[in-house]
Amino acid sequence: MPKLKTRKAAAKRFKATGTGKFLRRRAFRNHLLDHKSPKLKRHLATKAVVDRTDEDRVALMMPYA
């Protein structure tokens, strides 16, 4: 059986944790930041866990993660 290919777009966006979950970046922190509070920007800088409903889709795109 041939090797499965990893979706490179997904590999750049998600990171697998030791427990099998995936981490992602938060949205709304690329530009237009001057009106956002420092507290909000700090929060947006942290990683978030991919929702349980999307975990299977991300796992299919990254078979060796």
UniProtKB/Swiss-Prot annotation:
A Pfam short name: Ribosomal_L35p
Gene Ontology annotations for the cellular component aspect, listed alphabetically: cytosolic large ribosomal subunit
PROSITE patterns (alphabetical): RIBOSOMAL_L35
Ribosomal protein as UniProt keyword: yes
Encoding gene per record: rpmI
GO biological process terms on file: translation
MF (Gene Ontology): structural constituent of ribosome
Keyword Ribosomal protein: yes
Keywords: Ribonucleoprotein, Ribosomal protein
PANTHER family: 54S RIBOSOMAL PROTEIN BL35M, LARGE RIBOSOMAL SUBUNIT PROTEIN BL35M
Similarity comment: family membership: Belongs to the bacterial ribosomal protein bL35 family.
InterPro entries: Ribosomal_bL35, Ribosomal_bL35-like, Ribosomal_bL35_CS, Ribosomal_bL35_sf
Domain of life: Bacteria
The protein's name: Large ribosomal subunit protein bL35
